[in-house]
């Protein structure tokens, strides 16, 4: 895999910030918001846009994207090819390249160190706002239904 210290750190940051934690979380929130703003029940929106993500990730983890596509419905797969590029157009890749440059140049690290030195007020504010977002409130309610005593 060629895991060299600084390269691994850069890859990790890009993957986490742009794809896994940044991109995926925003996609789930936007999907949830789109459905609820259109009048769909929040619980159903949560299941469709957040809860089912684990199923898809598990399918990809165990067999790759093509294997996942062989398991999901033809309708879902067609939507992947038809709607996916409309939701995430190719210019997203250009923005990821810009983000990678900020990581590689040390700008991201500098910005984070400045934020941390101030007590991380922006991070704490974003964390607080997310905790009050309906997707988190509904998610807590849904997850509590699955808790085993």
Explain the meaning of each model-derived region.
Residues 1-10:
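Single conserved hydrophobic/aromatic residue that forms the stacking wall/gate
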Residues 14-22:
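A short glycine-threonine-serine/GTX helix/turn-capping micro-motif
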Residues 34-44:
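Inter-helical turn/loop segments and adjacent helix faces that build the functional surface
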Residues 37-38, 63-123:
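Interdomain hinge/lid region at the active-site interface
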Residues 42, 48-55, 63-64:
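Small-residue-rich helix-loop
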Residues 116-149:
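N-terminal charge/polar-biased segments
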């Amino acid at each position: 895999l060629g895991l060299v210290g600084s390269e691994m750190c850069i890859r990790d940051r890009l993957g986490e910030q742009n794809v896994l934690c940044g991109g995926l979380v925003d996609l789930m929130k936007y999907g949830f918001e789109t459905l609820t703003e259109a009048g769909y029940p929040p619980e159903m929106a949560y299941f469709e846009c957040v809860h089912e993500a684990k199923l898809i990730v598990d399918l990809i983890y165990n067999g790759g994207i093509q294997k996942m596509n062989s398991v999901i419905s033809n309708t879902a797969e067609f939507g992947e090819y038809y709607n996916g590029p409309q939701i995430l157009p190719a210019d997203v890749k250009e923005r990821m390249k810009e983000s990678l440059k900020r990581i590689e140049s040390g700008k991201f690290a500098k910005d984070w160190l400045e934020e941390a030195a101030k007590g991380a007020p922006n991070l704490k504010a974003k964390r607080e706002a997310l905790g009050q977002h309906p997707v988190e409130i509904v998610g807590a309610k849904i997850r509590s239904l699955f808790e085993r005593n």
